[in-house]
């Protein structure tokens, strides 16, 4: 398993010459478009939400983790969904709060080598995995009525 992961990472960072890099860009448009469509179709059905941003390194039991959980609960209690980056820390806490109130708990996860998987408090039908940061950022902005 570790060997496969190492090979995947090596392949991602292979040296390519300039024409190879540029010619592959034109085909990426289809991957980018697919991520936009997936995001639009999923998020347009959820209703009003607030995007919650914060550190992935904040641990459960700390002051800021507890505050983010409380914020998620309060948002969900007034009918607002919570959108986070889907990871641990403040993101997890915001999703946990929404989950406790049975509100919409959305995760916009990014697929990166060495990064976390999504947290367990995201509604599985509201988890979207992205490969492109800029598409993910659009979703944070387009479907939020507020930002924390």
What do the predicted segments below correspond to?
Residues 1-2:
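Charged, compositionally biased N-terminal leader segments and the immediate start
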Residues 5-6, 15-108, 116-117:
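Glycine-rich beta-alpha loop segments
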Residues 89-147:
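Acidic/glycine-enriched connector segments
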């Amino acid at each position: 398993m570790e060997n496969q992961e190492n090979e995947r990472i090596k392949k991602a960072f292979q040296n390519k010459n300039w024409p190879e890099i540029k010619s592959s860009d034109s085909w990426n448009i289809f991957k980018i478009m697919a991520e936009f469509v997936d995001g639009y179709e999923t998020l347009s059905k959820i209703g009003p939400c607030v995007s919650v941003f914060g550190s992935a390194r904040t641990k459960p039991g700390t002051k800021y983790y507890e505050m983010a959980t409380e914020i998620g609960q309060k948002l969900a209690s007034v009918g607002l969904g919570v959108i986070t980056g889907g990871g641990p820390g403040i993101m997890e806490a915001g999703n946990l709060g929404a989950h406790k109130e049975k509100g919409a708990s959305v995760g916009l996860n990014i697929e990166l080598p060495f990064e976390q998987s999504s947290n367990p408090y995201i509604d599985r039908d509201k988890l979207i995995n992205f490969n492109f940061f800029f598409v993910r950022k659009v979703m944070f902005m387009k479907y939020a009525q507020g930002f924390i």
